Amino acid sequence: MSAPRPISRPRVRRLATILSLAVVLAASGVAPASTAAAVSGASVEAAILSLVNRDRAALGLRPLRRDTRLATLADRRAANLAASRTFSHAAAGGDVGAELDRVGVQWYVWGELLAFRSGGLTSKTAAAIYGAWRNSDPHWSKLMSRTFNYIGFGTAVRTSNPRVFAVAVLTESRDHTAPRAEMLTATRSGTTITFTWRGWDPALQSHWAGLRDFDVWYRVDKGAWRRIRDNTTATSLSLSSRTPGHLYELAVSARDRAGNIGKISAPLGIRVP
């Protein structure tokens, strides 16, 4: 397991609130859309995130991770803009920090970006909105920040005098991304079977916890799973003297240094003839 960077020291919440006020001052409009195929809001949001992380990678930065709670909040705030005749952070719903607290999102610093584009959601919407943010230094500095580690995008369409409104909500938060694990190989020598696996903790720009250990799960002939190793840092396991004529399976789950536990992997099995 490769060692992650040390977890950043949490910032004082009072300072974070002051910084947030500066973060949310930027907003932008976008040039009118040309004719293009209609798409879903979810596809536009995913495309913007892909563009953001492409440019972060080019600058040697780690990706921003999508947080579904931030995306839900961003969707709601975009809908507020679509329903309002005013384009502002206040019209989007006011204090983002208070909203984050209300839905239980832990944060040290938050930021919000707004954009609008004439017309409906099309295949050109993501590039147009991201292009506007990219060409605005205040917006660009937030998206390429070394502080923020989570993001959520939201979009909404005003049908009368059609416009698309886009919102990005960013936070610097503790690592709450579950680590991943997968089985790699299953081999046999006589009645001894050996399994290997790997795990990783998705990297964050800040507060990255890093992979800690695994739990190992075992079953025979599709029976009940039982955990046979807890908190092991091993990435292989040999089991000897297995009874012939049975199928033996292993699966693993990973844990990071922040205590986040990932899903149990797909199992891998081998039969002893």
Protein language model features and the residues they cover:
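A well-ordered secondary-structure block
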Residues: 95-172
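Short beta-strand segments within Ig-like beta-sandwich modules, predominantly Fibronectin type-III
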Residues: 227-234
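Secretory targeting and sorting signals
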Residues: 3-38
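Solvent-exposed loop/turn segments flanking beta-strands in beta-repeat/beta-sandwich domains
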Residues: 200-220
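Surface-exposed, short loops/turns at beta-strand junctions within beta-sandwich domains
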Residues: 240-247
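Extracellular fibronectin type III
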Residues: 257-273
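Short, well-ordered surface patches within globular domains
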Residues: 39-103, 146-151
